[in-house]
Amino acid sequence: GVDLERINGFRSGFGDGMVEVMVVPMRKTERRQLYLDQIARFRRVSAVFAVSDYYAIDLMQFLGENGICVPADLAVAGFDGTPMSGLVFPALTTVRQDSGLRAKTALQKLRQLQEHQETQTTVTLPVTLVERASTRR
């Protein structure tokens, strides 16, 4: 799915062996247990890129509660560009995707399907990097 495409794109940008992937549970209690189990890993790496701002913000909260300072000890970035990303402390660096364009594109695709027109099954939308305090050292 989309998350796998993001991970593969990230890997291709950094090269083989430079990116470790952590599959994170959706349930918060299970996610927090995974974070606790992996705390040594968080102390070893220099940065984390989460597949969504939600997971990045959740991780930053966990890190702070466990004595790991963002960004001094670990840089954190997310994906979505949600309004919350600019309100947390430190403000989250994020890859923003225009949600209006995403909705417009989805509606166009649905109309094409309703009208039995051929349509692409995969659409790649432009993104913008919004650099904030969570990745500044």
Give each language-model segment a name.
Residues G1, M22, M26, A47-A50:
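A short glycine-/small-residue-rich loop at the edge of a beta-strand within enzyme catalytic domains
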Residues G1-S12, F49, A56-I57:
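Secondary-structure junction motif
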Residues V2-R6, R31, S99:
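Conserved donor sugar-nucleotide recognition element shared by glycan-biosynthetic enzymes
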Residues I7-R32:
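Short beta-strand elements in bilobed, periplasmic/extracellular small-molecule ligand-binding domains
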Residues M18-V19, Q33-R137:
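Flexible loop/turn connectors
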